């Protein structure tokens, strides 16, 4: 019998080409088909609010948010409840109201599994009953492995990639249940994965996250959990980004403060252990006088804990040497002054960290500025005497005759007899005295208002005209003052 050749299988139909997503977010890596979708998404990473209310000036990220806000001015309530005559400005308010009629309780407490009809009721319950408490493990969903207890630091289940703990699961996401909050509603996580949604959902506000550690950080906002402690002042924070920003306030406290390298030391780590991770970077770490607070865009979402916690401890590591900032980055001194460049900030920091060349003849205290010494003499010893302080400063100059940096200019030697403030010139003192006398010698001929200084009058007169001397080079809008222009330019930051 002749062998019958096996029929050749029909060629598989070509797979459908994946849709092009050419627009990528530089912050989180997500891709979008249209530029408009990317712009709308990127607003989450920035403080940009391009849609302004024409009545009150309040800004919004999206046009539909502005449309909802405008109804607060007009009183329009287009969303009507079918069970009662109540009306609402937006569909969200109507949905929250309808649970009164249906008896539905969609908000679940992950600690005791009580359910609530409103988010505010759940929030009150969490703060009263479970303040500082994290959820206990729940049973995993079908088809998912059994889980051990979650990590006490970041609530991960299984081998913890954040803090080095160990457990039963492995991997990341709902299929491995290793680096996520698999114990927080794993059945829902599996269903969400099938629906191509972020698998980890918050039972308090229904926000979804790609990783369990993000949900852990988010849940802390509902329960007031603050696991991140500052090793210098023992203040608590519920996010590592807030702790890092707070640590910068300690940078200018002087040589007596604990070294920054100690931040990365875990519990039980000795001096040698604490120094291993920082010795190689000591040459690149910025000096205390060169620290700067880089103000990143607001609204960046929940900070990820991965890489921010050292192995074996709950404290955040020392801040690494700052990357070279872009030209749009703002620099802020701890005294609250903002600067557009690092050079301007460094020049300003001389006032805080300059050489202590002015000495007090009574107690020997040293100060970098003459005004600071005179303030000390007035408060501590009940006297002034700028000339005596200047003489003492000259006696302390180096033998080489080289004047110390910044010591020969900008001295404040003209004092006010009312409040004893010091000024650099008689003109500045005369301008200041008007504060005590209440005199306002500069009137506006348009509206009759009076002003203490001529510069205030000039700025006010711009309100009556069309001149806007400070235009925006991006959109062309004009402003009366430079400070208003600076605030406006922050709206464009991140979209260039």
Swiss-Prot record:
**Where are residues bearing N-acetylmethionine located in the sequence?**
1
The entry's localization annotation reads: Cytoplasm; Nucleus
Quick one: where is this thing mainly located? cytoplasm
Q: In which tissues is it expressed?
A: Widely expressed.
Q: Which GO terms describe its biological process?
A: positive regulation of transcription by RNA polymerase II
Q: Which keywords does this chain's UniProt record carry? A: Acetylation, Cytoplasm, Metal-binding, Nucleus, Repeat, Repressor, Transcription, Transcription regulation, Zinc, Zinc-finger
Keyword presence, Signal: no
Any Pfam family = zf-C2H2
MF terms from GO for this chain are: receptor tyrosine kinase binding; RNA polymerase II-specific DNA-binding transcription factor binding; transcription coactivator activity; zinc ion binding
**Where is the chain membrane-spanning?**
none
- Spell out the PROSITE patterns in the cross-references: ZINC_FINGER_C2H2_1, ZINC_FINGER_C2H2_2
Q: Where is the composition biased (Low complexity)?
A: 259-280
What segment(s) does the record annotate as region Disordered? 250-280, 378-412
C2H2-type zinc fingers: which residues? 23-45, 51-73, 79-101, 107-130, 200-222, 228-250, 331-352, 358-381, 414-436, 442-464, 470-492
InterPro entries the UniProt entry points to: Znf-C2H2_ZIC1-5/GLI1-3-like (IPR056436), Znf_C2H2_sf (IPR036236), Znf_C2H2_type (IPR013087)
Query: Where does the record locate the signal sequence feature?
Result: none
Q: Name one GO cellular component term.
A: nucleus
Its biological purpose: May be a transcriptional repressor of NRL function in photoreceptors. Does not repress CRX-mediated transactivation.
Report the protein name in the record.
Flt3-interacting zinc finger protein 1
Q: Which organism is this protein's natural source?
A: Homo sapiens (Human)
């Amino acid at each position: 019998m002749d062998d019958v050749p096996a029929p050749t299988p029909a060629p598989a139909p070509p797979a459908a080409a994946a849709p092009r997503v050419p627009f990528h977010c530089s912050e989180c890596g997500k891709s979008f088909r249209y530029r408009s979708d990317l712009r709308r998404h990127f607003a989450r990473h920035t403080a940009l609010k391009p849609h302004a209310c024409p009545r009150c000036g309040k800004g919004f990220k999206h046009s539909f948010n502005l449309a909802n806000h405008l109804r607060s001015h007009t009183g329009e309530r287009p969303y009507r409840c079918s069970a009662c005559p109540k009306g609402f400005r937006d569909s969200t308010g109507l949905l929250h109201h309808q649970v009164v009629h249906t008896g539905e309780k969609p908000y679940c407490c992950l600690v005791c599994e009580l359910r609530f009809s409103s988010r505010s009721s759940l929030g009150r319950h969490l703060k009263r009953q479970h303040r500082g408490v994290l959820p206990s493990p729940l049973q995993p969903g079908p088809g998912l492995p059994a889980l051990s207890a979650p990590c006490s630091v970041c609530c991960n289940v299984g081998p913890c990639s954040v803090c080095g703990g160990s457990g039963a699961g492995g991997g990341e996401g709902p299929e491995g249940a290793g680096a996520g909050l698999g114990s927080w509603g794993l059945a829902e996580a599996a269903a969400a994965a099938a629906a191509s949604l972020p698998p980890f959902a918050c039972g308090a506000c229904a926000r979804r996250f790609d990783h369990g550690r993000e949900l852990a950080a988010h849940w802390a906002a509902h329960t007031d959990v603050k696991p991140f402690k500052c090793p210098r002042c023992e203040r608590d924070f519920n996010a590592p980004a807030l702790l890092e920003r707070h640590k910068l306030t300690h940078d200018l406290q002087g040589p007596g403060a604990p070294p920054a390298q100690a931040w990365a030391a875990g519990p039980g780590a000795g001096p040698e252990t604490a120094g291993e991770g920082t010795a190689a970077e000591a040459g690149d770490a910025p000096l205390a006088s060169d620290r700067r607070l880089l103000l990143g865009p607001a609204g960046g979402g929940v900070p990820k804990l991965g890489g921010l916690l050292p192995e074996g401890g709950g404290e955040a590591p020392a801040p690494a040497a700052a990357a070279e900032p872009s030209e749009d980055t703002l620099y802020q001194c701890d005294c609250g002054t903002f600067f557009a460049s690092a050079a301007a900030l460094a020049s300003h920091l001389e006032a805080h960290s300059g050489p202590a060349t002015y000495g007090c003849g009574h107690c020997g205290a040293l100060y970098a500025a003459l005004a600071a010494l005179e303030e000390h003499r007035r408060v501590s010893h009940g006297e002034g005497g700028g000339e005596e302080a200047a003489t003492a400063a000259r006696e302390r100059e180096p033998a080489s005759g080289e004047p110390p940096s910044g010591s020969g200019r900008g001295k404040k030697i003209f004092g006010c007899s009312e409040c004893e403030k010091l000024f650099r010139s008689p003109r500045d003192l005369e301008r200041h005295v008007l504060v005590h006398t209440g005199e306002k010698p500069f009137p506006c001929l348009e509206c009759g208002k009076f002003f203490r200084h001529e510069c205030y009058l000039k700025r006010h007169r711009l309100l009556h005209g069309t001149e806007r001397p400070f235009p925006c080079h991006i959109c062309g809008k004009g402003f009366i003052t430079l400070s208003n222009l600076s605030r406006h330019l922050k709206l464009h930051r991140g979209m260039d």
